[in-house]
Amino acid sequence: AARIAYFLDLSGPNFALSAACSSGLLAVHQASQALLNNECDMALAGGVSLILSPITHLGLAHSKMLGRSHPAPVFSPNASGIVPGDAIAAIVLKRYDDAVRDGNTIHGILAASAVNYDGKTLGMASPSPARQSQLIEKVLDKAHLDPNQVQMVMAHSVGSALTDKIEYEAVSKALKS
């Protein structure tokens, strides 16, 4: 994080986060909070997952978490586990009025965000449908949105018969479908 800020001459809050699969979205949440608190006027948030060693695959295989097919058949009865991969994603965030004033192209509006952790569940990699539903409901409330207004949901969905089902249940309950 410091190297990027140095080379791009960025100032303001600067830190790296580690929250497993949710690190990138946690970074977006933290960046949006920094903007709301006037700690900065623009934020760069993102996530990186680079598997640079076979140790990761060995650990997943030992835990019986690796999928047998690629791509992983998410939300499917044929789901057999995760297929890890490398990825890098980053976005620039700005307050809406500032982006309009500066003539920036606006690709989306983050109406609200929130963070939670599921606590003790069936296992460390297993989500809690109740806590996920509560978080979704909290974000909808903060954004003043009715569940019927939701047009798209981006899900974690790793291709696991257990966790995909739990995530589906959580989203369905929160959106009351």
Task: For every predicted segment, state its role.
Residues A1-S177:
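Condensing-enzyme catalytic core of the thiolase-fold
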